[in-house]
Amino acid sequence: MSWWQDMDQRGGVSSPSGALASAEPAPASVTLAELLHLVQKGQEVPGLEKRHITATHGEPTASLLPRRPKPWEDAGSAASPCTIALDTRTQPPTIEERSRGSPAAQLDGGPRVS
């Protein structure tokens, strides 16, 4: 037996506040099959509150809370040790380092010092 057939046999979903609901007139009980039929035909579902939600077209309200810092934004220092270490490894080589590593310097025996 599937869950919707079980719901049909029990007569629908009971409200969580069953004791309080008994004081008020009970809304029309609809089985799941009847509910499906009503929705497919585009008809009103009995006991369902209809909300009228419309756009406001007004200006959005400004946030009252301060902006939270991003995880990589450290309020204490401008650069963390991790970013300093990364910066030193990614620096371009100096002129001396370039001349030692160049193919012309290797063929010629390196830079000459006078």
Curated annotation (Swiss-Prot):
The modification Phosphoserine is found at S102. Residues 1-26, 53-114 are annotated as: Disordered. Keywords: Peroxisome, Phosphoprotein. It is found in: Peroxisome. GO terms for cellular component: peroxisome. Pfam families: KPWE_dom. May be a peroxin involved in the PTS2-mediated protein import pathway. This is Peroxisomal biogenesis factor 39. The gene is Pex39.
